[in-house]
Amino acid sequence: MSNIAAPRLPVPGPDLRAPGQGGPAFDDQVFNRLLANRIVFLGSVVEDSIANAICAQLLLLNAEDPTRDIFLYINSPGGSVSAGMAIYDTMQFVENDVATVSLGLAASMGQFLLCAGASGKRYSLPHARIMMHQPSGGIGGTASDIAIQAEQMLYTKRMMQERIAFHTGQPIEQIERDSDRDRWFTAEEAKDYGFVDHVVQQARQVPSEGPVS
């Protein structure tokens, strides 16, 4: 990240910082500096409060300038499908290209969001690990409730497979086979599969939009 002093970006409405990532002063300094450089960071399990913060940040950056790229950095083991789909839909909704960068781990919903970045602008650091599998969830209640939940799980599974096939260029039959169990990829394997477009080792290999003037 550039050492040039970046202005503090106003944070609208509720606190957009991810919980549990240091005290308020640390969060203010780091996350506002990242936002000023059009960087959004997903560094935890995907759940509702995290998704709300990331969606708000994407909308904020789109409103500020709909022509400049947004960079979503991902180090996540996955999480809630509904929370992840809120982020996914917002990525597609904003006018900006959303570039994605994986570091550490992009598993499950983290993998899904990684491959959903703008075509040609999906990156992985060399030692990141990517894992794809089918969505899972508990089923309980009456027989009728179980039938409804099972139907919804099948719908979610098919929908996500179709989206992954779209973003990777893989046949959906291949996605069905490969996501039936946990499948792990190195960064280079993820590139070959179509999850990412580039494996990079240095920050200068990821184009930067720079701070807001």
Curated annotation (Swiss-Prot):
GO molecular function: ATP-dependent peptidase activity; ATPase binding; serine-type endopeptidase activity
Name of the protein in question: ATP-dependent Clp protease proteolytic subunit 1
Active site: 108, 133
Pfam families: CLP_protease
Self-association and partners: Fourteen ClpP subunits assemble into 2 heptameric rings which stack back to back to give a disk-like structure with a central cavity, resembling the structure of eukaryotic proteasomes.
Function: Cleaves peptides in various proteins in a process that requires ATP hydrolysis. Has a chymotrypsin-like activity. Plays a major role in the degradation of misfolded proteins.
Alphabetical list of InterPro entries matching this protein: ClpP, ClpP/crotonase-like_dom_sf, ClpP/TepA, ClpP_His_AS
Catalytic activity: Hydrolysis of proteins to small peptides in the presence of ATP and magnesium. alpha-casein is the usual test substrate. In the absence of ATP, only oligopeptides shorter than five residues are hydrolyzed (such as succinyl-Leu-Tyr-|-NHMec, and Leu-Tyr-Leu-|-Tyr-Trp, in which cleavage of the -Tyr-|-Leu- and -Tyr-|-Trp bonds also occurs)
Alphabetical UniProt keywords: Cytoplasm, Hydrolase, Protease, Serine protease
Enzyme class, spelled out: hydrolase
Gene: clpP1
GO cellular component: cytoplasm; endopeptidase Clp complex
Biological processes annotated in GO: protein quality control for misfolded or incompletely synthesized proteins
Top-level taxon: Bacteria
Taxonomic classification: Bacteria, Bacillati, Actinomycetota, Actinomycetes, Frankiales
Localization (cell): Cytoplasm
EC number: 3.4.21.92
Entry's family note: Belongs to the peptidase S14 family.
Annotated SUPFAM superfamilies: ClpP/crotonase
Organism this protein belongs to: Frankia casuarinae (strain DSM 45818 / CECT 9043 / HFP020203 / CcI3)
